[in-house]
């Protein structure tokens, strides 16, 4: 039985501590939309998305109003388009992105993900065509997000794809130079991508998923920070226990919203993603949680240990609160989307190398990193390769969302607006990785991938 304290605590979490549901994401299978005629295929995609997601936004708004729980985004993820487009006799894959964008705008969602390709072991003809079309697709659409999986623990790292993605990211930046290379903020390069991720820009509806599903992503870094303020000076066991209890409460709210949305839309409930997802709002920052543990500035020595504790405690608390936990489930460290990370990067406390170390112990990887516009494609590919290696060897999801901002140099700032925030341009290592990237081929899977 809930007492008055729990009710008031929840109200405080929402009104004062930035607790919210980051996203309700509807996953839709498009496997029945394949057709040799690209125009027919695109029409089938548009019709199916608008039919299934017709009431997604209004349902989210009704739940938000009735329960008093802020739901920031309503989103859609679809089957990786490379799998659908491959049956088409046309190579104009941008048309698929435009059909997705039109459908997303029709139903009123914030983003649609799934202009994606899975090439961790090699390319098909369709994969190559889709990857080549990413820059134009993202520059010509508003709501479409793209992802490419270039590595897995079972397959190793496809270095040909890694090299190609460096060039693709540079092209994305070039085509959207007038908006601070915004297309790059809608493109993620993965190792060990998951099939049920509700978060953008990396969401896609995996081939093992049902016809349609509801996945929910929670948020609430501000709630965790406020909880830690009450245990100042306590030992790490107390810190962990405090985070666990808070994560439990946050996840219960996510479970409630997911089940309610599932019931009202008559769509199966998939998972709750436990990830602490920051926003640019002051007080809604993962970096501030780490600083509350006793670090003067996020990025100093001890940051990786603090983040490991946070990530572990969030998982332990969250899994008790939901029957199905999935997605990425941890703590996100997107630099431009986190007020504390922005401050740390601008003060010099947080470097690209330190962020890479932090990705070893948290959810996903190098996220929303702005680098100088003259950063070479090979350097970007090498950054992706490093991050993929961390994911492959540690059997975890890692990713890179990097923005080489045209005309910008170290110390400048790029404004994206909204949840994407603003990013300080960070220094990259000036020495070349070009000859390494040119080798191509595939880095073999690690020994511990042989589980059978």
UniProtKB/Swiss-Prot annotation:
Q: Which family does it belong to?
A: Belongs to the UPF0210 family.
Q: Which Pfam families match?
A: DUF711
**Protein's recorded name:** UPF0210 protein Ccel_1722
Q: Where are the transmembrane segments?
A: none
- Complex formation: Homodimer.
Q: Which PANTHER family match?
A: UPF0210 PROTEIN MJ1665, UPF0210 PROTEIN SPR0218
| InterPro entries, alphabetized | UPF0210
């Amino acid at each position: 039985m809930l007492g008055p304290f729990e009710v008031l605590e929840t109200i405080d979490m929402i009104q004062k501590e930035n607790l919210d549901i980051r996203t309700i994401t509807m996953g839709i299978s498009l496997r029945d939309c394949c057709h040799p005629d690209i125009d027919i295929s695109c029409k089938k995609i548009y019709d199916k998305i608008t039919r299934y997601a017709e009431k997604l936004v209004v349902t989210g708004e009704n739940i938000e109003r009735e329960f008093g729980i802020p739901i920031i985004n309503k989103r859609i993820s679809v089957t990786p388009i490379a799998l659908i487009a491959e049956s088409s006799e046309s190579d104009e894959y941008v048309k698929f992105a435009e059909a997705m964008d039109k459908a997303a705008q029709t139903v009123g969602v914030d983003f649609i993900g799934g202009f994606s390709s899975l090439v961790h072991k090699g390319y098909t003809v369709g994969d190559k065509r889709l990857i080549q079309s990413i820059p134009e697709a993202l520059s010509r659409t508003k709501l479409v997000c793209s992802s490419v999986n270039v590595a897995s623990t079972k397959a190793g790292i496809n270095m040909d794809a890694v090299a190609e993605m460096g060039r693709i990211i540079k092209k994305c930046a070039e085509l959207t130079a007038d908006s601070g290379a915004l297309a790059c903020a809608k493109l993620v390069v993965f190792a060990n991508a998951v099939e049920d991720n509700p978060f953008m820009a990396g969401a896609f509806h995996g081939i093992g998923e049902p016809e349609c599903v509801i996945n929910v992503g929670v948020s609430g870094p501000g709630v965790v920070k406020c909880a830690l303020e009450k245990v100042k000076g306590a030992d790490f066991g107390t810190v962990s226990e405090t985070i666990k209890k808070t994560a439990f409460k946050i996840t219960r709210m996510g479970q409630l919203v997911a089940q309610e949305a599932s019931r009202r839309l008559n769509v199966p409930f998939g998972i709750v993603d436990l990830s602490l997802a920051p926003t640019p709002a002051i007080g809604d920052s993962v970096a501030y949680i780490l600083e509350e543990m006793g670090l003067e500035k996020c990025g100093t020595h001890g940051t990786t240990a603090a983040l490991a504790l946070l990530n572990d405690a969030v998982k332990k608390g969250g899994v008790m609160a939901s029957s199905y936990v999935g997605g990425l489930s941890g703590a996100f460290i997107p630099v431009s989307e986190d007020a504390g990370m922005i401050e740390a990067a601008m003060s010099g406390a947080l470097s690209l190398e330190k962020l890479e170390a932090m990705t070893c112990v948290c959810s996903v990887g190098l996220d929303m990193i702005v680098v100088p516009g003259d950063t070479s494609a090979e350097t970007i590919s090498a950054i992706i390769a490093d991050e993929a290696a961390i994911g492959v060897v540690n059997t975890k999801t890692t990713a890179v969302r990097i923005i080489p901002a045209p005309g910008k140099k170290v110390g400048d700032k790029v404004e994206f607006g909204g949840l994407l925030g603003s990013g300080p341009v960070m220094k990259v290592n000036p020495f070349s990785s070009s000859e390494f990237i040119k080798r191509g081929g595939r880095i073999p899977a690690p020994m511990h991938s042989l589980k059978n």
